[in-house]
Amino acid sequence: MPHPEPRIHCSNPHCTASNSLEAHFCNRCNTPTIKRYLWSNKAIVPNEPGSTISSRYLALSPQIFLDTQPSKAPVTPEEVPPEIVAYLQLFPCYPHVPQVYGLLDNTDAWLLDYGTVPSSPSGQLKYPQQLIPKFQTLWSDAAAFQQLNWLWQMAKLWKPLSSKKVASTLLNPDLIRINGQVLQLLELEFDREYQPSLRNLGSTWKEWSQNAHFTIKDVVEQLGSFLETGKIEDIRQAIAVLDKAIANCRLVSKYSYQIYALTDSGPNRSNNEDAVYPTVDPQNIPQLEKSLAIVCDGVGGHDGGEIASGETINYLESKISQLALEELSPGKILGKLTKYINGANDIISQRNDSEQRQERERMGTTLVMALSCAHEMYLAHVGDSRIYWITPDSCHQVTTDDDLASREVRLGYAIYRDSLQYPSAGALIQAVGMRDSTALHPNLQRYMIESDCIFLLCTDGLSDFDRVEQHWQHQILPVLDGKKDLPSAVNSLIEIANQENGHDNVTVALVHCKVSSQSNIPEEIVSWSDVESALNESNLWADNNLAGSFADSLNIDDSPLEETKIPISTMPDIIGGDENLPARKQPKWLKPLILALIISTIAGVVAIFCLENIDPDPDQNKLPSVRESDTEISE
């Protein structure tokens, strides 16, 4: 009996029509096809090649599967098993560390999600046996800048992976992959007999130095030796050395940036609480060596959101525009950005207090910001507005939302796609201006730019319901190919947000990074003596989301902001149906928690009753006052 031709279903949950694998758009509702390729942490031999498991996962190899029903929630267990807790707690390291997608039906294999993987315009895998190309196969032919950048990304991951006892992953080249300009780990390898040290990392790098680019071979070899012999005891020293080497290598390239941004109130809102910087003439977009883009989504009251988003942008732009970035170290720039975000926060918070705004009347704003200088891109975010990094082969979401769903994941309580089904999953746990800056924890990152790419900054008016994942190839990628200009792309994304979402204001900013070679500047050998001084620099730093700043290592108050709870929007009915979305599940830990509270309450009542009968002295029966530290923060 011939095997039926595999089909892929529409990702729109109100449609789910069956389409051919070659289809770019759904034949019923015209939603762009999403092809989500997944990796299984265990090899599964299908009944026959090209067959599907549980009529859903198309087997392309024993460990590579295509989800043919992307709108359907994956299978997840009632309780989170120990073997995936590290993935969940390393959620802030995405996209370097893959997300757990769910269980492969009727197996004990876990499916891992990388966002996008290299594929052709028709959706065919470019690396059908590897899914994502191996670092080891690309290393020897890579440019000096690329090699240093890959080592730099590994160094940033060392501390968080060590904290979860999975640092062995960085010593196994088979698990290290390169997806666009991002180093991704295929899966995590758990430390077994001993926990790897920097000496082990140094031995590995020293071995790789044999095939390093001739201009940096000395640097990589000596850096490996210093790690191997214990002369470097802090991974931040290695990061500082790599920073200096990269700064030398980038001199052969010229960097320029163009930004176009637009905001729109949307079809169903009379006012616009979003704000954006910069606003420029679409006919005259400047090319800059340094650039700044800011997107804010205001929350709180009819007029409060507009005030908060506008004042935040005005304050940040006025401060950042005065920075001499080329004279500052990465650590100082990150420190300045943190200081300025906290400053903007306190301005809004103090205005809330002076105007006696309470609960839902308090105003605040989400924030995403991209600051570029030469080969460096600094990113900051607070709230659930997002930043995506687009290259010719990839679209990576490089921010994680500050909401309850993400918090459940990084605490190890839930798988992300499962947590999205929880009530109030989109409730913010922080926003600029809602609380004093002592309770604010801005997320900051830094990336190196190897080649042409685009950063998309947007509010949830666009990012909701996977619109970016659906449309980036058709609307943003043509800009990189020279087939579309920035204003056209931004206008298209605004139109998509209004037509396919339409429930909120929408703001979009595109930052186009262009890298060209400077033919008049030859490649020069970077020696160890050129970078060794970085070992003694006192201002060592690390991106705060890749330096162990998880909930178990920082005293972060991430209780939900009552006044910023975002109602779960109803999916637009594109094809005219009136089906309801599946009911959102309660957290799996909620029932045991309620039971424990009931038991403890009963026990407390019994204890009080017994004490009253034992000692009738009324002065001795007064319960102690509750300590301030034991109470929840009231809004």
Range-by-range predicted roles:
Residues E5-R7, H14, A23-T33, L60-Q153, ...:
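PP2C/PPM-type serine/threonine phosphatase catalytic domain
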Residues W208-S209:
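Long, charge-rich alpha-helical interaction segments
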Residues H24-F25, N30, L38-W39, G50-S51:
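Long, low-complexity intrinsically disordered regions enriched in Ser/Thr/Pro/Gly
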Residues N19-S20, L198:
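ABC ATPase "signature" C-loop motif in nucleotide-binding domains
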Residues C15-A17, I34-R36, S40-E48:
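N-terminal sensory and localization modules of signal-transduction and trafficking proteins
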Residues D191-S203:
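Active-site Asp-x-Gly
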